[in-house]
Amino acid sequence: MNKKDVIIVGAGPSGIFTAYELLQLNNNLKITIIEKGKPIEKRNCPINKIGKCIQCKPCCNITCGFAGAGAFSDAKLSLYDKDSEEVLVGGNLPTIIGNQETKNLIDYCDKIYLQFGADPKIEGIENKNEILEIKNKAKENNKFNRHSY
């Protein structure tokens, strides 16, 4: 039997980054990532052909598999305007750990994405006022978030 040092369940962004971080600490680790989704080349959604969700098994072909739903998204990450103090996209993290620490973590993750070939051009940041308006509307209409930060 081939022994592993670490087994990670789930190949979404958290699982992938966990493996990456562990290998930065010790590049001799034997890591296995277990993912219930199909290989990326076999992931497709039949909704456009048949007009409705068929509840793919064992899980949704869009959300399950390597890179999670991000494999088929617009690859939106939590980023911020370098000329502003405001973190424009990314939820409540700045409220929890502060703007500067959030920016440090975003920069760290962005650097890794760029290292692996991500496009360095940031789309949409020129629409700062529109982004802030959408963000504020989302906050106002979020009846499900009962957390107080």
Which role fits each region the language model picked out?
Residues 28-35, 40:
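Short beta-strand "acidic-cap" motif of Rossmann-like dinucleotide-binding folds
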Residues 1-14, 32-34:
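Beta1/beta-strand and adjacent pyrophosphate-binding region of the FAD-binding site
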Residues 2-4, 16, 78, 112:
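Broad hydrophobic/π-residue packing in well-ordered secondary structure
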Residues 39-43, 47-149:
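Conserved N-terminal/central alpha/beta ligand/cofactor-binding core
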Residues 3-4, 27-30, 66-67:
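Short coil/turn connectors at secondary-structure junctions
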Residues 19, 23-24:
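Gly/Ala-rich phosphate-binding loop of Rossmann-like dinucleotide-binding domains
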